[in-house]
Amino acid sequence: MAKFIRNLADKAPSMVAAAVTYSKPRLATFWHYARVELVPPTLGEIPTAIQSMKSIIHSAQTGNFKHLTVKEAVLNGLVATEVWMWFYIGEIIGKRGIVGYDV
């Protein structure tokens, strides 16, 4: 066991350096898209979002959603699932734990 720990301690700096080298470009890409995609909506985008919600409610009331193509229905389902999961992530962060959720 001591040999394993000594061997691991000898290899740790090179393993950490390799991990840092591997993750630097990926982290830069992540931060680029995070800055673009995770910004709050501007005041000009809010009326567009409200109009979009009104059209969704109207299509649900009139039954127009039955005329969606399969591709549109799948995309709408994926977006709804993403919003639902972000809600759960926010709840988990707010409670500071997964306990109490059927995850």
Curated annotation (Swiss-Prot):
The protein's matches in PANTHER family, at most eight in alphabetical order, are given as:
ATP SYNTHASE SUBUNIT (PTHR12386)
What the protein does comes down to:
Subunit g, of the mitochondrial membrane ATP synthase complex (F(1)F(0) ATP synthase or Complex V) that produces ATP from ADP in the presence of a proton gradient across the membrane which is generated by electron transport complexes of the respiratory chain. ATP synthase complex consist of a soluble F(1) head domain - the catalytic core - and a membrane F(1) domain - the membrane proton channel. These two domains are linked by a central stalk rotating inside the F(1) region and a stationary peripheral stalk.
Q: How does it assemble?
A: Component of the ATP synthase complex composed at least of ATP5F1A/subunit alpha, ATP5F1B/subunit beta, ATP5MC1/subunit c (homooctomer), MT-ATP6/subunit a, MT-ATP8/subunit 8, ATP5ME/subunit e, ATP5MF/subunit f, ATP5MG/subunit g, ATP5MK/subunit k, ATP5MJ/subunit j, ATP5F1C/subunit gamma, ATP5F1D/subunit delta, ATP5F1E/subunit epsilon, ATP5PF/subunit F6, ATP5PB/subunit b, ATP5PD/subunit d, ATP5PO/subunit OSCP.
Q: What is this protein called?
A: ATP synthase F(0) complex subunit g, mitochondrial
Question: Can you say where in the cell this protein is located?
Answer: Mitochondrion; Mitochondrion inner membrane
CC annotations in GO? mitochondrial inner membrane; proton-transporting ATP synthase complex
Task: Give the species this sequence originates from.
Answer: Rattus norvegicus (Rat)
Post-translational modification N-acetylalanine, affected residues:
2
Recorded family membership: Belongs to the ATPase g subunit family.
GO terms (molecular function) for this protein are: proton transmembrane transporter activity
